[in-house]
């Protein structure tokens, strides 16, 4: 597809910087969200990535109406040559992430846990005993209960049925 060279370069620069590219499958979208400041249509992004995919420079995934493209090693080399970048510059997906340093902890609690609140076993036992009175038979009380006369009514949406007598 014919597209301005500035659009192709903007797409390739973003792809090389991030290492991945995401685009919604919408050819009528006026601007790609990540390239909105450069006024690049979403169709140009999709077609440029399709071209790179056919040459084996990106891997494509598609899920939930979105394309996901990942740079391959050959694609990194191609974009480095195309954009005239030195070998020291690498995509964000290949950079090592530094482990985040946590908040500094207070000196007094190193290796220690604060003690739990002391609760006696008596609290637990009284709770368990209060639920079921002693001497009650659980199996005898299971079932429909003390009601011996059942009344059946018409179901939901099945008409009114007969009036009770």
UniProtKB/Swiss-Prot annotation:
This is Small ribosomal subunit protein eS10. Residues 154-165 have a biased composition (Gly residues). The lineage of its organism: Eukaryota, Metazoa, Chordata, Craniata, Vertebrata. Component of the 40S ribosomal subunit. The ribosome is a large ribonucleoprotein complex responsible for the synthesis of proteins in the cell. InterPro entries: Plectin_eS10_N (IPR005326), Ribosomal_eS10 (IPR037447), WH-like_DNA-bd_sf (IPR036388). Component of the small ribosomal subunit. Keywords: Cytoplasm, Nucleus, Ribonucleoprotein, Ribosomal protein. It is found in: Cytoplasm; Nucleus, Nucleolus. Coiled coil: none annotated. GO terms for cellular component: cytosolic small ribosomal subunit; nucleolus. Residues 142-153 have a biased composition (Low complexity). Its main location: cytoplasm. PANTHER family: 40S RIBOSOMAL PROTEIN S10, RIBOSOMAL PROTEIN S10. One of its GO terms (molecular function) is structural constituent of ribosome. It comes from the Eukaryota. Residues 97-128 have a biased composition (Basic and acidic residues). Transmembrane segments: none annotated. It comes from Xenopus laevis. Residues 92-165 are annotated as: Disordered. Belongs to the eukaryotic ribosomal protein eS10 family.
């Amino acid at each position: 597809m014919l597209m301005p060279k500035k659009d192709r370069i903007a797409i390739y620069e973003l792809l090389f910087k991030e290492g991945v590219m995401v685009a919604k499958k919408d050819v009528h979208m006026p601007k790609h969200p990540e390239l909105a400041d450069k006024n690049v249509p979403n169709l140009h992004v999709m077609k440029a990535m399709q071209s790179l995919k056919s040459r084996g420079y990106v891997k494509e995934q598609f899920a939930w109406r979105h394309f996901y493209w990942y740079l391959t090693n050959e694609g990194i080399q191609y974009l480095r040559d195309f954009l005239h970048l030195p070998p020291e510059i690498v995509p964000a997906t290949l950079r090592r992430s530094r482990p985040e340093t946590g908040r500094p902890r207070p000196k007094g609690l190193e290796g220690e846990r604060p003690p739990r609140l002391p609760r006696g076993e008596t609290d637990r036992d009284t709770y368990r005993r209060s639920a079921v009175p002693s001497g009650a038979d659980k199996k005898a009380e299971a079932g429909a209960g003390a009601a011996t006369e059942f009344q059946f009514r018409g179901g939901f949406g099945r008409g009114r049925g007969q009036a009770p007598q």
